[in-house]
From Swiss-Prot:
Subunit structure as annotated in this protein's UniProt entry: Homodimer and heterodimers. Interacts with CYSTM3, CYSTM4, CYSTM5, CYSTM6, CYSTM10, WIH1/CYSTM13 and CYSTM11. Binds weakly to CYSTM1, CYSTM2 and CYSTM12.
Topology relative to the membrane: Single-pass membrane protein
Distribution of this protein across tissues and organs: Mostly expressed in siliques and, to a lower extent, in stems, roots, leaves and flowers.
Protein known as: Protein CYSTEINE-RICH TRANSMEMBRANE MODULE 7
Organism: Arabidopsis thaliana (Mouse-ear cress)
Length: 97
């Protein structure tokens, strides 16, 4: 097997390919710039800004210390009505039976 040595000095980069047209630059952005996303009223509800993002507030922030006891802490965090109804019957109204 003969190994061929290519001299880097004599290597010429190929010209532009005839298959592809030269890339046209993107047109400049419109001036004046377009409105930002929330510049007009947000979502059609008459809010000048999007509603602030807040994490879920703690139960302490809503209820303070010891306002609700018994089954209410469970009911506050209950996700489904079925779960709440079962717990109310089993826990809160146990004294009726």
């Amino acid at each position: 097997m003969a190994s061929y040595h290519v001299s880097h000095d004599s290597y010429q980069s190929p010209g532009p390919s005839p298959l592809y047209q030269p890339i046209i630059e993107a047109p400049p952005p419109p001036y004046p710039p377009t409105r930002t996303r929330y510049q007009d009223y947000y979502g059609g509800y008459g809010q000048p800004h999007p509603p602030p993002l807040r994490p879920y507030r703690s139960d302490h922030e809503y209820y303070g210390d010891g306002e609700y006891v018994g089954c209410f802490p469970f009911l506050r965090s209950c996700l489904t009505t079925l779960c709440c109804c079962w717990f109310v019957e089993q826990c809160c109204f146990r004294s009726r039976y």
